[in-house]
Regions:
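ATP/nucleoside-binding phosphotransfer catalytic cores, i.e., glycine-rich phosphate-binding loops
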Residues: 190-193, 199-294
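Ligand-binding beta-strand-loop-alpha-helix segment within the catalytic cores
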Residues: 4, 62-136
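Histidine-anchored nucleotide/phosphate-binding helix
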Residues: 49-60, 358-382, 386
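Metal-dependent de-N-acetylase/amidase catalytic core
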Residues: 172-178, 182-187, 279-348, 367-371, ...
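Single conserved hydrophobic/aromatic residue that forms the stacking wall/gate
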Residues: 1-7, 12
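Class I SAM-dependent methyltransferase SAM-binding "motif I" and its flanking Rossmann-like core
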Residues: 148-192
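Glycine-rich beta-strand-to-loop/alpha-helix junction loops that act as flexible
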Residues: 40-45, 139-143, 206
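Short Gly/Thr/Asp-enriched flexible loops that form oxyanion-binding sites at enzyme active sites
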Residues: 49-55, 147-159, 512-528
Length: 628
């Protein structure tokens, strides 16, 4: 199985390798006067590949007139008015933008009668053979290792068939489908044998959330509990990952186990932390024998002894710890992560949603405020679709009651709007999207919670900025493309505040992609300011936080802010101000813990790791990486 890494640490999804292979196959088939037969999935990781193929078609360097497409799977059973048909998604994302002939597009029938399902599947297999078999299969991967809709337990001999959708896949599908319609219980899917019959197979995966499963697929033994692992048996299978999705592969995470290394400070730190965890010792107790017995003899040659390497990495980690995230005034900052001057600093904390600031760095925000820095918080999106309908109902009951109590129900706008929204919710179907008025009310609820949290953290309300970036306001899970308008809104705030410190989300495992888009908007605005020669940028540092969906690996941490038990409690209180995001919040992800519990667990785990390595023992720690 061939593994190709593309992109950078900031998850640039370069799909040209896959597009090159497909384009070459199409052109070769055209030269020979043959069809080029493709099995195509609809996973989000394939979007970038489809966009690249569309670009080549639009530039007139590639035609798809000889291409035959077979949809890899379809939901079953579908209602006639269903918006869930995967073939429609495939057309919307790809096929309708190129010149594939309509008569050459085939899909399994999600409407077929149950007693005709087997015949439908058998006919699909025969039709593939009629065209000479599959030339290429282009697929993504689910969290359980499923490919197409082949759930764990699917055998290597399995062919096109009806299969029950597993709970993990269902959760993933519900999160990714751009509709509130209930996912059907089953799928009609190409089998493992069908996919492996393709001459070439491409599997693409992007992002941190795929790192764990990709390590198992590529490096673990073949097993039917991990259907994608059967790709190891294919003579021309290509796994294409970005660095985030490849993060747990041995060659990336522990390269010293497979090759000689170029030993950077970060890699040495990673190796020593791994060694400490493997043998259960703190850094300063590691010996030459420990290094030699665990494949790290190169470091002994580099540093001369275990003692020298231990001291170097211990000091590096020690210097990441600071109780002064804005820099300690009038102090030697040689070994501190932040400079002492200027003091006080102007700080902007960019928060993708209206609670990410306190979830990810609530303790650090309080510390910055207490140490007299000029702290601004910028909430980049409204977060409106993450508010449940019952929250709107509760607030509408309140305002209607307020109208009755103090205005004798004379405010007809409130009365009419109350009745209108009450009627809408009473008739609302699962697949219905909210009206613009309801989305506005939901955004207002989140604004109120954010203001309450900021007041609790002693941030003046004139330092609280609601940017409402336009890309978010689709009313759906899938957002609009980021545009210059989004960037200009962020840039205007930067020009107004002229910060010495900027905090942005580095939590790119957010399953809906909002964090990445928000961070991209900030970095794009900074690039524009750089081009314009902005003076304030010469004395500004950018720090990236995590916490809502993942935590920084210790080899990457450059600043770690310790929290006492009291400070951790205050952080929890800040998060709890966001009441709409507690148990009933729509998008808690596949982690059953509430966000305050996730944050505390991650912060405590970071502190525990520092303690195990022989450094100071704290209740919790918030970690940051500098963006350079």
């Amino acid at each position: 199985i061939g593994v190709r890494l593309v992109g950078s640490e900031m998850c640039i999804r370069d799909s040209s390798h896959v597009a090159d292979g497909i384009a070459a196959g199409i052109k070769a088939a055209q030269h020979d006067g043959k069809f080029y037969v493709m099995a195509l999935g609809t996973g989000s990781s394939l979007t970038a590949v489809y966009e690249e193929l569309i670009r080549r078609y639009q530039e007139k360097t590639l035609s798809f007139r000889n291409v035959v497409v077979f949809n890899a799977y379809e939901y079953y059973p579908l209602q006639q008015e269903s918006s869930l048909r995967t073939i429609n998604q495939l057309k919307e994302r790809f096929l309708s933008h190129v010149d594939v002939q309509e008569q050459n597009i085939f899909s399994l029938d999600g409407f077929v009668a149950q007693d005709a399902v087997q015949d439908c599947c058998r006919l699909y297999e025969q039709r593939i053979k009629t065209f000479g078999g599959l030339d290429v299969a282009l697929i993504g991967i689910g969290r359980s290792g499923n490919i197409a809709a082949n759930e764990p337990g699917s055998g290597i001999q399995s062919v096109t068939r009806l299969i029950l959708i597993g709970n993990t896949s269902r959760e993933e599908m519900e999160a990714s489908e751009q509709t509130k319609e209930t996912i059907p219980p089953c799928s009609l899917t190409m089998g493992i044998a069908t996919l492996l019959s393709a001459k070439t197979v491409y599997l693409t995966a992007w992002g941190e959330e795929k790192a764990e499963i990709m390590q198992k697929v590529v490096e673990n033994s073949i097993t039917d509990t991990l259907p994608a692992s059967f790709l190891q048996t294919h003579p021309d299978a290509h796994v294409v990952l970005d660095l985030s999705a490849a993060a747990h592969l041995t060659r990336i995470e522990h390269p010293w186990l497979v090759t000689s290394c170029q030993w950077t400070d970060k890699l040495v730190r990673s190796a020593l932390v791994w060694l400490c965890q493997k043998i259960g010792k703190p850094i300063l107790k590691l010996t030459n024998k420990d290094y030699n017995e665990n494949g790290l003899s190169e470091l002994l040659a580099l540093y001369g002894s275990a003692y020298n390497a231990n001291i170097k990495i211990f000091n590096d980690l020690q210097h990441t710890i600071t109780g002064w995230p804005g820099g300690k005034p009038n102090a030697d900052d040689t070994y501190r992560p932040e400079r002492s001057k200027p003091y006080p600093k102007r700080v902007i904390v960019f928060s993708p949603h209206p609670d990410d600031d306190v979830i990810s760095m609530g303790g650090t925000i309080r510390r910055l405020v207490q140490q007299k820095h000029d702290v601004h918080v910028a909430y980049e999106t409204s977060g409106n679709i993450a508010v449940g309908d019952e929250e709107v109902t509760r607030f509408m009951h309140f305002i209607n009651g307020f109208n009755q109590l103090f205005a004798d129900s004379k405010d007809s706008v409130i009365s009419d709007k109350y009745k209108e929204i009450k009627t809408f919710f009473a008739k609302k179907k699962e697949s219905d999207f909210d009206t613009r008025d309801i989305l506005t009310i939901k955004g207002l609820i989140r604004r109120g919670e954010a203001r309450t949290a900021c007041t609790y953290n002693e941030i003046p309300l004139d330092h609280v900025h609601f940017l409402d970036l336009p890309f978010y306001e689709s009313g759906k899970i899938e957002k609009l493309p980021m545009t210059e308008k989004d960037v200009e809104i962020v840039r205007a705030l930067l020009q107004e505040v002229k910060p010495h410190q900027i905090y942005v989300a580095g939590d790119l495992a957010d399953p809906h992609g909002t964090h990445k888009k928000c961070t991209d908007a900030v970095l794009a605005a900074i690039d524009e300011e750089k081009k314009a020669g902005a003076e304030w940028l010469k004395d500004c540092r950018i720090w990236m936080y995590r916490g809502a969906w993942a935590e920084w690996e210790i080899e990457n941490i450059e600043m770690c802010v310790p929290l006492s038990p009291e400070e951790l409690r205050a952080k929890r209180n800040s998060i709890l101000k966001h009441q709409s995001q507690m148990e009933s919040a729509p998008f808690l992800g596949n982690d059953e813990r509430l966000f305050w519990q996730r944050a505390e667990d991650r912060n405590r785990a970071t502190a525990s790791l520092y303690d195990q390595l022989g450094l100071a023992c704290y209740e919790a720690m918030e970690a940051f990486v500098e963006y350079k």
